[in-house]
Structures are given as structure tokens and as C-alpha cells.
Amino acid sequence: LTTPGTAIGSSRYALSEEDYARMPEIFAKWKIKYVLPTGGNGTMDTCGKIRRACEGTDIRVVGIPKTIDNDIAVTDHTPGYGSSARYLAETVAEIGADVKSLPIHVCIVEAMGRNAGWITAASALAREKKGDAPHLIYLPERPFREEEFLEDVKRLYEELGGVVVVASEGLKKENGEPIVPPIFRSGRSVYYGDVGAYLAELVIRKLGIKARSEKPGICGRASIPLQSAVDREEAVLAGRTALESALAGQTGVMVSFVREASEDGSYRMHPGTVPIEEVMMYERKVPESYINERGNDVTEEFVSWCKPLADVHHREFIDFQEYYWERKGKRE
């Protein structure tokens, strides 16, 4: 549980129809009876196709969701997301403290997540009080409007001096095209352009304000010290549930997490299974109710949903200027 990535290896090999047709024979040869594909949307699509190929056999196929992007359908959330959310939130909190100490520029933090803004949105958990970073959050679920972005940055810069913006790597224009052309496309894989650098350059050229960009990238899915304890426990639970389901005779399903309502507002969840056909290649986006009206932040509804998953550890940052003005106000 302290190894980043996966100890068993991973693959992006695109399986052909011939590959699927051979699978029952290969499984029989190696006496494989239980197949538990673990991954995101593409993996769940593969899971469904393997199940179809093995129809009529005693081979059981059960999908285990695992993606930091949190974009798999018919589950409250996915293993991996809580840890990536915690990493980004705590990293943005540290960046915010740094920018606040020398408030002379705009810092753009680019977050992973492709077409879904779940990771980007989690940066809101960095805040403890009004004025804390991030000051602006932009998700791919809303069209990116350059003029509004520049207006927001200018207003906050004049008010605060230092501004922290978190933007998704998948930001799109009104016409649905990426704001920065992808470097490369191959099947489902898209190698995004440098959105953070593009936005920083935009601020410099259009507003004449110093700006820089930061790109944590895969650090958020590889950081064991910032792994969410809730996420770790639920990842183990997902694997255990998948195996138990397969041993019980289930096939063609994926493990899902169902959040339970509680009178005291505490977080409760139980695992279940859903038909794999309901999940295959469906991309789950951040709902409208989680995004504010202007499209430059998230709502409290999202924060309440995300907080128990990320298990963010807020550290105390000292600000002597705030301390001075607080003491001065008390004396007066």
C-alpha cells in the first residue's frame, strides 16, 4: 500500500476483436476463472467486451474502478480520486502561502483530469477562510471565456496583489475546441497542450502583470505521503468486493460505491455492483450544481461532497501581517 502506481503493471495496448475471441482459450489454458480488470473508462469498456467474449463459459468478469479522474459513471466516486484531491488541495494551500508572502504576481496551477473537472474542483478544499487560495477555479465543464478570465484576474490582483488560479488541462472554448491545441492524439489518448503556460502568458500580454505556471502532473497520483486514508481503505474494499462478487457467481458487473444519507451529516458509504453495460465508455462530468454561476469556482455543495473523501490535513500557516492587524484592531 506504499507503492505508487501499480505493482502488477499496466497497459494501453488496444485489443482487437481477434484478441477478445482468443481470450476464453487463453484463460482455459492457464486455468484462469476470475478476471478482475482494474482501471478507468477504457478498462471498464474492455471489461464489458471480455465478459461478452466469455459468455457461455464459467469465467467470471468483474470490474474494479480505479481512476484519479473520478469520471466513471454509476458510482459516487472512484478509488484514487480522494488521494489526488488531497494532494492538489494541500499543494495549492502551500502555493497560496508562498504567493501571499510576496504578492506581486499571478500563479496558474494546471490540474489533470482530461474532460472532467473533478480534480481541479478539489483544489477548493485548500481554503480555510475567506481570501485563501485558490482564488479562481476553472473546469472543462464550462466554456472558457478569455475576457471574463482576464476581468476576474485583474479585479483580484488589484484587491489582493497575489492571485492563485487553478485551471483544468481540458479547458475548452465556446465551440468545444481545447483552448490550447493538443500536442498529440492517438485513439482515446489526448496529450494536452500546456494550458497553464498559455494562461500565464495571456495574463502577462493582456494585463501586464507578472505571471507563472505550475504543473504538478502525475505527482498527484504518485504521492504516497499525501494519500487519503479514506481512499486507501476504500481501494482495498473495492478489490475485496470484486473478488467476493466473482466468487459468488456474479459476472459482467463493476463494483460501485453508494453514499448513504445520515442524520448527523457524517460520511457513510457501502459497496455494491452495477451492470458493466451502464458504465462502458460513459464519461461522468462535474454536475452544474457543483459549479458557481460565473463558472470561476465551485459551490459549497461540491465542497461538502468532496471533503470526506480527500481527508485534507490543514497545516497552520503563520502570517505576521494578519496577526499585526488583528492585534491592532483589538487595541483600538
Predicted regions and their residues:
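Flexible loop/turn segments at secondary-structure boundaries
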Residues: M44-D45, N70-D71, N115-G117, K173-N175, ...
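Short, ordered loop/turn segments at secondary-structure junctions
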Residues: R12-Y13, G40-N41, I64-N70, E141-P143, ...
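Short, basic, glycine/proline-bearing loop/turn elements
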Residues: T6-S11, L136-P140, Q227
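C-terminal non-catalytic interaction/assembly regions of soluble proteins
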Residues: P178-E332
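Accessory alpha-helical/coil subdomains and C-terminal extensions
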Residues: P37-G39, D45-K49, A53-C54, D58, ...
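Glycine-rich oxoanion-binding loops at beta->alpha junctions
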Residues: L1-K33, G42-T43, I68, P79-G82, ...
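Gly-rich Lys/Arg/Thr-decorated short loops/hinges at beta-loop-alpha junctions or inter-strand turns
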Residues: L1-S10, K66-D76, S101-H105, P181-I183
